[in-house]
Amino acid sequence: MSVAADFSDTEQILASDLLITYTCDVRPTPEQQATLKAFLEQGGRWFALHGTNSLLDFDTTNGPIDAFGVTIPGVPYAPDLAPDYMAMLGTRFVTHPPIQEFEVTVTQPDHPLMAGIEDFTTEDEPYCCDVLGDINILLESRYSSENMSELPDGWDNPNRVHPQMYLKKVGGGEILYLMLGHSCGQFDMQPIMEQCDVVKCSWGLPVYYELLERGLSWGIAAQVPGS
């Protein structure tokens, strides 16, 4: 097993059977993207969590802004910085309104990964993502909140389906993506701010740990409980 902060150890990735990512704004170079694709095509499995599909930048047009008492360079946004990487993942993060409560619906109760899982309510970042290519949705949500009205380009449509967990085949391999899972520890925002509020979101739910365990079983043994 190897732990890394980015995708730079391409030899280790290619030598692995399972890749797990829990990242935000970690940008693979073109060479690293080619390695990730080769890893999947040779049969690798990738369990991607939360912000893996989130690459961020700041719109500095109007200069620095104050965000919750902290000065940041500008308005954060998610430009399409790595289209091939996002196409490989199957989704690209675009935006999210504030953390809020929403329902998560099981779309395929007979799928081995979903066996015995019931619809549930969570409080998390309601991710709004472009869907790129063919994905097999296992969990989905529809957001209905006044906060959504602030979002552009039709994201405020209460009937719009937002994938929360899905599978995507790439060559001989496969990606399992779980959107839920924002968290923030007391010191996670350093050096931007000294301390911040602890936020656990879906990590506080037993069903979330069940989904994680099933994802690990899927990745390690190419099977899940009950399959």
What is each PLM-predicted segment?
Residues 151-165, 169-227:
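Extracellular ligand-binding/catalytic regions of CAZymes and related secreted enzymes
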Residues 6-8, 24-28, 46, 52-56, ...:
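Solvent-exposed loop/turn segments at secondary-structure junctions
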Residues 26-116:
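A glycine-rich, often tryptophan-bearing local segment used as a flexible ligand/cofactor-contacting loop or short
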Residues 3-8, 34, 160-165:
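Alpha-helical scaffolding within the catalytic cores
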Residues 18-27, 201-204:
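The substrate-binding groove and active-site-proximal loops of carbohydrate-active enzymes
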Residues 1-17, 216, 220-224:
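Aromatic-Pro/Gly-enriched surface loop or interdomain linker
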Residues 2-3, 18-22, 45-49, 137-139, ...:
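Structural recognition of the beta-strand scaffold that forms the well-ordered cores
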Residues 91-179:
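Catalytic beta-strand/loop cores that center a nucleophilic Ser/Cys/Thr
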